[in-house]
Regions:
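Aromatic-rich carbohydrate-recognition surfaces in CAZymes
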Residues: 258, 362, 366-367, 371-382, ...
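Catalytic cores of carbohydrate-active enzymes
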Residues: 152-154, 169, 400-402, 528-653, ...
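Active-site acid/base region of carbohydrate-active enzymes
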Residues: 96, 321-335, 384, 389-390, ...
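Anionic coordination/interaction segments
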Residues: 1-366, 380, 385-388, 392, ...
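C-terminal beta-strand-rich structural cap/linker in extracellular carbohydrate-active enzymes
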Residues: 802-816
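Generic long, charged, amphipathic alpha-helical segments
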Residues: 636-663, 764-788
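Solvent-exposed loop and edge beta-strand segments that line ligand/cofactor-binding
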Residues: 352-366, 410-420, 510-526, 587-612, ...
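Inter-helical turn/loop segments and adjacent helix faces that build the functional surface
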Residues: 140-147, 272-276, 435-448, 535-557, ...
Length: 816
């Protein structure tokens, strides 16, 4: 069953039923102000950091679900006094509408609805040049009689720190402050004290009434689905003093038949320097707020801001596009996959409908992978993020696992000592320099972090190349009894905790003190070392003559790669597939000898990507085992058989019910590793088959089962051992987005970067006979035509050397 459809021409997903299986959301924001917006108007906004600068309040785990956001109420008063009340976005009133349509576009959403011959068209977006949301509401009278209407707005303010806001009520119920000035409601909580920021909600009409106190607006023992002010058609003109600050405007409107009225609301954020917080008379400095409101007060100004937003996304998506005879493939590559990559890069894993914005910031591992999906669109932002993330690396080569975006200070709030972390930096930096030719990054001054998360102040000057060397040496030189890298707290699979041994339900697997076994080893990290070691060696050789920052590192890396490849084949080959690990007692994990968890996807995928054991056809055998034991119609399970009881020697992975999350779920993030491995092996039909099993556009028809948005990837789909196979959770913020874009754009379609130019090396399904790719590379537009007349999977790779120029470079490649 579907709940909408793709409008590829407008780059929108159109939802025609408000009761989607879960809230289907969109993201707004291109700079520092960001918003989450559901198909019924739910969600919230924040400035830079969803934990520390939350602007509007949102209640996770609420009943009904998704029941706070930016809401509007229409009160329709008939001549006989009868009234009907409805919400243009369906929620919060949930009155049955005569029509409803939500369109999620690139950085904006619209909701069109009607009730009793009144049509409401609402536009929501964050402009590229302002720290605010714009809400434009147009009401039209389609009846033959005059309509007397009341339009109410409603948002609820968060008291900035989202965690404190939901826990510290003994204080917070006393500190809320607001000010109302000419229809603009200012939220000033703590501005008199330590804060230099405030928010506001304005309307470009003189309001008929307002409220800033939630209790006054809603009434006693009621909710936002039945506010007392809406029922009575009044406003309390209330001023919040503590309790629950909110912002509601009321506008009384008369519409003749055929007449329309448009109202513009701005929900904004302002920071003032300390010396400019107050005017000379001691009043709030509203200069910046009034300038923002003035810049967005007319239809023409809003239209211009929307045009700027459209141009922004048009530019981003112009850097890579494909044209084939498969419209689902084209829409994934050209629109939705790249859009999700940008959102995931921006949010990391901090703020979604599954991540509360409280527990996680910008992850070291996460962001290095996310950059793989956006660096062709955003090289400058990629460069800065690489510097930021390298700055939370520790001097020994390990790293803090995350940092908060507002402070950029490393922290162990969700654990540390994940020994895969350092190697992702090598992959991301190498990919960035291949993309841009910016070898100067290697000499960029980047400090290491001290144990407090702040930049180390030991007087030593370090550069980016030092971080890459430390990362590689740290992993290569910390090995276990079988010569494989030590796993630490965990590797990419956070829940494979081989040194944890936790029996206390009140402990976190991610933060509990681990046993320093010195024996638990990761085959995944070993394969990553081979893969990233080749990247480091290539980078070292390519940088010769440009910088001495990596002098001698290529030789070290290649020696380590050759040694580790041999060790994997000798000590981690199980006969039909690669082991996953050795535990703290040197027992095999992911072996045919194990009754449960006998095969894992990660080591098969990454060993295949790195072509470990290819001379012995180990990669092909491992991939065949994936197909036999892990693959099914909804994707590839992370492991099989699923664990049925808790095993404290393996940790959190065994605490999940069978078939969910890391215990046998389809962890979509590593499905593309297998897709790439199949492409490396030249098996294009199988690579594309796996791609289609989890790509949202290809599974839209099972939206009632899948539940999450049919236009973006989810982190997890319930696996074959679960009670609900095919049901997804945790959409939007997942490394799945970047890795699937890498898999399809670089390995199936086969357009990859090198230090010398572009490599054209497609591995196609046999029924894809012709395609055209436009790829911007170092400022040059490449127009690449790929012909596959005989329906083959793969041909010989071709290098197109880079040459600067202003004219498009046209290339024709034929698979022979």
């Amino acid at each position: 069953m579907k709940y909408g459809y793709f409008d590829d021409e407008r780059k929108e997903y159109v939802i025609n039923n408000p009761e989607t299986p879960s809230p289907w959301i969109n993201y707004f924001g291109t700079g520092d102000f960001y918003s989450l917006f559901s198909n019924t108007g739910g969600g919230y906004c924040f400035y830079k950091d969803a934990l520390l600068r939350r602007i509007t309040r949102y209640r996770y785990n609420n009943i009904p679900e998704d029941m706070n956001g930016r809401y509007f109420y229409v009160r329709d008063i008939a001549e006989d006094g009868e009234t009907s009340v409805w919400s243009p976005g369906w929620k919060p009133l949930m009155t049955k509408l005569d029509s409803y349509e939500c369109r999620h576009g690139l950085g904006y959403s619209t909701i069109s609805s009607s009730k009793n011959d009144v049509n409401a068209e609402s536009l929501f977006f964050v402009p590229t040049e302002h720290n605010c949301e714009v809400h434009k509401v147009k009401l039209t009278n389609n009846s033959k009689v005059k309509k007397n209407l009341q339009l109410y707005s409603y948002v609820e303010f968060c008291l900035w720190n989202a965690l404190d806001d939901m826990t510290n009520f003994q204080r917070n119920l006393n500190i809320g402050e607001v000010e109302v000035d000419n229809g603009t409601i200012y939220h000033l909580t703590e501005y008199r004290e330590r804060r230099n920021h405030y928010s506001f909600y304005s309307m470009n009409r003189e309001p008929s009434g307002f409220d800033t106190d939630r209790n006054t607006f809603i009434g006693q023992s009621r909710g936002i689905d039945n506010p007392e002010c809406i029922e009575k058609g009044i406003s309390g003109n209330s001023k919040a003093h503590g309790w629950y600050p909110c912002a509601s405007h009321r506008l009384d409107i008369e519409l003749e038949p055929g007449q329309s009225e448009t109202v513009i609301f701005v929900l904004g954020y302002i920071e003032n320097d300390d010396e400019q917080k107050w005017l000379s008379d001691g009043s709030l400095n509203k200069k910046s707020a009034k300038a923002m409101i003035s810049a967005l007060s007319t239809d023409e100004q809003v239209d211009e801001a929307m045009a700027d937003l459209a141009a922004y996304w048009e530019d981003k998506l112009s850097h890579y596009s494909v044209k084939t005879d498969n419209e689902k493939l084209d829409r994934m590559v050209n629109i939705w996959n790249q859009y999700q990559c940008m959102v995931t890069y921006t949010m990391s894993r901090s703020a979604s409908y599954y991540e509360s914005g409280i527990g996680r910031g910008i992850g070291f591992r996460d962001t290095n992978q996310d950059l793989l999906g956006i660096m062709h669109m955003e090289p400058a932002k990629t460069r800065q993020r690489l510097i930021d993330v390298a700055s939370i690396q520790l001097p020994h080569g390990g790293a803090f696992h995350q940092y908060q975006p507002l402070t950029k200070r490393g922290n162990d709030a969700i654990g540390g000592d994940f020994n895969d972390d350092p190697l992702w930096l090598i992959m991301a930096v190498g990919a960035y320099i291949r993309e841009t030719g910016d070898f100067a990054l290697l000499d960029e001054k980047v400090p290491f972090a001290g144990t407090d998360g702040h930049p180390l102040s030991d007087g030593k000057e370090t550069i980016m190349a030092d971080h890459l060397k430390k990362a590689f040496h740290y992993i290569n030189e910390n090995r276990g009894p079988h010569g494989l890298p030590l796993i630490g707290r965990a590797d990419w699979n956070d829940c494979l905790n081989l040194n944890c041994f936790s029996k206390d339900p009140d402990e976190s697997f991610q933060t509990v003190v681990n046993v320093d076994s010195g024996t638990a080893e990761s085959v995944l990290i070993a394969a990553m070392l081979v893969y990233s070691g080749r990247e480091l060696a290539d980078l070292g050789r390519a940088s010769e003559g440009k910088t001495n920052a990596l002098a001698g590192e290529a030789e070290y890396a290649i020696k380590a790669v050759d040694e580790m490849s041999n060790i994997i084949c000798e000590n981690a080959w199980d006969g039909e597939w690669f082991l996953r690990a050795y535990d703290a007692n040197s027992n095999k994990v992911g072996s045919s000898e194990n009754a449960e968890g006998s095969i894992f996807i990660e080591s098969q995928g990454f060993c295949g990507m790195a072509a470990v054991g290819a001379d012995k056809q180990y990669n092909l055998k491992a991939l065949d085992s994936v197909e036999k034991h892990l693959a099914h119609q909804y994707g590839i399970d992370i492991l099989a058989p699923a664990f049925t009881s808790y095993d404290y020697s393996k940790g959190e992975i065994t605490s999940y019910p069978p078939g969910y999350k890391e215990n046998g779920g389809i962890f979509c993030h590593n499905n593309p590793w297998v897709i790439i491995a199949e492409a490396v092996a030249g098996r294009g039909d199988k690579a594309f088959d796996y791609y289609k099993r989890i790509a949202p556009a290809f599974i839209e028809d099972i939206s009632d089962l899948h539940r999450t948005e049919p236009y973006v990837y989810a982190q997890m789909i319930a696996g074959s051992a679960s009670q609900t196979p095919g049901q997804a959770k945790n959409s939007w913020l997942t490394g799945t987005a970047a890795w699937n874009f890498v898999a399809i754009s670089q390995w199936i379609l086969g357009i990859r970067t090198s230090y010398e130019g572009l490599i054209i090396d497609p591995c196609l399904p046999s029924d894809l006979r012709h395609l055209e790719v436009e790829r911007t590379f170092r400022g040059v537009k490449y127009q690449i035509t790929i012909e596959n007349p005989e329906g083959k999977n793969k041909g010989e790779a071709m290098l197109v050397p880079f040459a600067e120029g202003t004219e498009p470079c046209k290339v024709v490649y034929t698979i022979k």
